[in-house]
């Protein structure tokens, strides 16, 4: 795969810079494609924006980059209002899929391109190029041309070119989507390592791949129909999604009908009628009422209790799907289908078996319909 990098032409400022979006709104020909959105990305933080096609995630990134003019609101990078500044004055770099490295330039010259555009001294250019190639593990390929590299190697060169200019902010727009699965997996690990080595770099990462987001991001924002419908720390958002769309888009989830009965003695937990049983579940909202939903991740269910406080559903096994290291079970729980994922199950239960499905109260989340 070939990548295009857009880099600043002015020296990046010292220190770290976060991003603040203040009621940012974007419209094309009068049609609103991004509803007023407020979001803060802390300095040195990796924020992943995920969502289906057309949700507005790439529009946010392009607005931050300066390629889309907002219809309202402000964009701040550090303490600077960049809303109306051209891209080259924003102190950022951007890696986008499906655009070529310069085919007539060697790897080292591709990486040096932004620095030369900045008219940096030759000694500084050589130092930055050497360091950037070392950071992405491409030092041995400095004299090669793009056509002599694999897709993953070309991508590393594109990222090296971006970080060589020492941007305040790095924007990544689905940079792994065109790579094969194994290369993509390796590059996710490489990007995680890159941020460990450059902890001062603020990264806005747009992807449709939830695994990339979960692996790389400190925080995740979930977009739908031009709105930010969920935002939070990665683990907390996965563990306790605020709504059905977030729970199902960020990983697989069982969604069951439920009735909230009232608070328990434990903070944050409520009694819930669900699946033919009264259980305890996490809730951040109303503690009473009908028309609630219960969210449980398939991997949070087990065939044995994990503690004295474990919840239990009685279930009938409908199907078994063995997939090597994992076994997927589909069960009937009070007329609703529940999926569970198990490891190292021996012996395997049989279709029609009566099972007890156990889960911890904090792994069950009460959400609104």
From Swiss-Prot:
InterPro entries: AAA+_ATPase, ABC_SmlMolc_Importer, ABC_transporter-like_ATP-bd, ABC_transporter-like_CS, AminoethylPonate_ABC_PhnT, Mo/tungstate-bd_C_term_dom, P-loop_NTPase, Transp-assoc_OB_typ2
Molecular function GO terms recorded: ATP binding; ATP hydrolysis activity; transmembrane transporter activity
Membrane topology: Peripheral membrane protein
Binding sites annotated in the UniProt record for ATP: 51-58
Keyword Metal-binding annotated: no
Residue intervals of the ABC transporter domain: 19-250
Keyword annotations from UniProtKB, A to Z: ATP-binding, Cell inner membrane, Cell membrane, Membrane, Nucleotide-binding, Transport
One term under GO cellular component: ATP-binding cassette (ABC) transporter complex
Xref: Pfam families: ABC_tran (PF00005), TOBE_2 (PF08402)
Predominant location category: membrane
Gene3D superfamilies: P-loop containing nucleotide triphosphate hydrolases
Record's subcellular location: Cell inner membrane
Role played: Probably part of the PhnSTUV complex (TC 3.A.1.11.5) involved in 2-aminoethylphosphonate import. Probably responsible for energy coupling to the transport system.
Family from the record: Belongs to the ABC transporter superfamily. 2-aminoethylphosphonate importer (TC 3.A.1.11.5) family.
Protein name as catalogued: Putative 2-aminoethylphosphonate import ATP-binding protein PhnT
Gene: phnT
């Amino acid at each position: 795969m070939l990548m295009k990098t857009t880099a600043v032409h002015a020296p990046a400022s010292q220190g770290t810079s976060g991003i603040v979006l203040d009621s940012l709104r974007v419209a094309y020909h009068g049609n609103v494609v991004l509803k007023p959105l407020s979001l803060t990305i802390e300095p040195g933080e990796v924020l992943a924006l995920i969502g289906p096609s057309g949700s507005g995630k790439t529009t946010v990134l392009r607005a931050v980059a300066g390629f889309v003019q907002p219809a309202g609101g402000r964009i701040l990078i550090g303490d600077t209002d960049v809303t109306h500044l051209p891209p080259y004055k924003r102190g950022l770099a951007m890696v986008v899929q499906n655009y070529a490295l310069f085919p007539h330039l060697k790897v080292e010259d591709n990486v040096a391109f932004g620095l030369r555009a900045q008219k940096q001294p030759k000694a500084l250019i050589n130092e930055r190029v050497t360091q950037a190639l070392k950071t992405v593990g491409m030092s041995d390929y400095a004299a090669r041309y793009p056509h002599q590299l694999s897709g993953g190697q070309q991508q590393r060169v594109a990222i090296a070119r971006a970080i060589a200019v020492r941007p305040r902010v790095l924007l990544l727009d689905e940079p792994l989507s065109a790579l094969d699965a194994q290369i993509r997996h390796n590059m996710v690990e490489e990007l995680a390592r890159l941020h460990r080595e450059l902890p001062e770099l603020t990264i806005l990462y747009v992807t449709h791949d939830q695994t990339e987001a979960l692996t790389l991001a400190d925080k995740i924002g979930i977009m739908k129909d031009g709105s930010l419908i969920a935002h939070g720390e990665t683990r907390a958002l996965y563990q306790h999604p605020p709504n059905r769309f977030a729970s199902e888009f960020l990983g697989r989830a069982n969604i069951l009908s439920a009735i909230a009965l009232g608070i328990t003695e434990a903070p944050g937990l409520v009694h819930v009628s669900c699946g033919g049983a009264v259980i305890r579940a996490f809730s951040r909202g109303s503690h009473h009422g009908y028309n609630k939903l219960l969210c449980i991740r398939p991997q949070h269910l087990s065939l044995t209790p994990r503690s004295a406080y474990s919840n239990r559903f009685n279930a009938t096994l409908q199907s078994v799907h063995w997939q090597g290291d994992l076994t997927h079970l589909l069960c009937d729980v009070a007329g609703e289908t529940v999926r569970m994922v198990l490891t190292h199950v021996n012996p395997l239960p049989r279709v029609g078996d009566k099972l007890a499905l156990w889960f911890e109260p904090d792994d069950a989340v009460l959400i609104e319909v």
